Curated annotation (Swiss-Prot):
Protein name as it appears in the record: Cytochrome b
Organism classification: Eukaryota, Metazoa, Chordata, Craniata, Vertebrata
Keyword Heme in record: yes
Entries under Pfam families matching the protein: Cytochrom_B_C, Cytochrome_B
PANTHER family: CYTOCHROME B (PTHR19271:SF16)
Location in the cell: Mitochondrion inner membrane
Length: 380
């Protein structure tokens, strides 16, 4: 009998074990689609980004014009640019939903997978930040100035670090060229980390909505979940293309249509919508170093979630108190996102401070306490 190439070929076997014959819990819901959607986002961003990089010029005198040239003169350049810019938004929507799923269903108990996931989030945020600087509009320039300046809050080495990052004494040509280099490099780092993320996930297998072992009831990934994933791809790509074609600038800042001018500061400096929650936390602390630490903590706190899990149950499916807290946290992050887009004045300052305090309190204090209380109530 002829050998099955799919199961015996050294390379095809790896693909087979990851995407075809992978034993998968039979009850995972649509919340488990976001991992594959993130993969599609990554591939889309790399392809569109590569096409844009072929026509872009990383020079302060030419960057803005080169982006205009892409949109006006390159075949379908406007579409490629709009897909790339809005693709970033979809990437963040998917990753936030993916993290939310992980928090709700206790997937963070796969510690290695979770920790690499958090590193992936940090890499994605870094990539998006350096990418936003490249069109060299007003918000690109001032966003880069404000965010890189935060490193100067680090005691002793801060100022040296900032000037080293800038390649001079202000955000200028060296900054733009190195940001372009980093923006080109980081997606491939993300690809590598994604493979490690998947390797660790396939060591344990997927979690499921009940949070109980599912070894007794596994089904092959193909055809069941390949079909389910393709439905997700179609829906997401339809939404992305619709956004890119009908209102490509909906999520952007009008300020970025003005070329960068170091002599004119925009009235409201704010990042893209997907960073607003962290920006609100940064702004809510009146001290520079304190704000930077809070900003870092807002993401790094995710590393602590596996250590703060006190419940005897893995998932929140059967934990109503934790569910209430979880949805309060979601609402809280949305409030932070809104506050981050508002000017620094009353009442937004106090709302931001309360929301920032609540964010950390829910994650660090209330989640573990609620879980302990539920253990008692359920006599576990």
């Amino acid at each position: 009998m002829a050998l099955n190439l799919r199961k015996n070929h050294r390379i095809l076997k790896i693909i087979n074990d990851a995407l075809i014959d992978l034993p998968t819990p039979s009850n995972i819901s649509t919340w488990w689609n976001f991992g594959s959607l993130l993969g599609v986002c990554l591939i889309t961003q790399i392809i569109t980004g590569l096409l844009l990089a072929m026509h872009y010029t990383a020079d302060t005198n030419l960057a803005f014009s080169s982006v205009a040239h892409i949109c006006r003169d390159v075949q379908f350049g406007w579409l490629i640019r709009n897909l790339h810019a809005n693709g970033a938004s979809f990437f963040f929507i998917c990753i936030y939903l993916h993290i939310g799923r992980g928090l709700y269903y206790g997937s963070y108990l796969y510690k290695e997978t979770w920790n690499i996931g958090v590193i992936l989030l940090l890499a994605l945020m870094a990539t998006a930040f350096v990418g936003y600087v490249l069109p060299w509009g007003q918000m690109s320039f001032w966003g880069a100035t404000v965010i890189t300046n935060l490193f100067s809050a680090i005691p002793y080495i801060g100022q040296t670090l900032v000037e080293w990052a800038w390649g001079g004494f202000s955000v200028d040509n060296p900054t733009l060229t190195r940001f372009f280099a980093l923006h080109f490099l980081l997606p491939f780092v993300i690809v590598g980390l994604t493979l490690v993320h998947l390797t660790f996930l396939h060591e344990t297998g997927s979690n499921n909505p009940l949070g109980i072992p599912s070894d007794c009831d596994k089904i092959p990934f193909h055809p069941y979940y390949t079909i389910k994933d393709i439905l997700g791809f179609v829906l997401m790509l339809s939404l992305l293309v619709s956004l890119a074609l009908f209102s490509p600038n909906l999520l952007g800042d009008p300020e970025n249509f003005t070329p960068a001018n170091p002599l004119v500061t925009p009235p409201h400096i704010k990042p893209e919508w997907y960073f607003l929650f962290a920006y609100a936390i940064l702004r809510s602390i009146p001290n520079k170093l304190g704000g930077v630490l809070a900003l870092a903590a807002s993401i790094l706190v995710l590393f602590l979630t596996p250590l703060l899990h006190t419940s005897k149950l893995r998932s929140m499916t059967f934990r109503p108190l934790s569910q209430i807290l979880f949805w309060t946290l979601v609402a809280n992050v949305l409030i932070l996102t809104w506050v981050g887009s508002q000017p620094v004045e009353h009442p937004f300052i106090i709302i931001g401070q309360l929301a920032s305090f609540t964010y950390f309190t829910i994650i660090l204090v209330l989640f573990p306490l609620a879980a302990l209380l539920e253990n008692k109530l359920l006599k576990l």
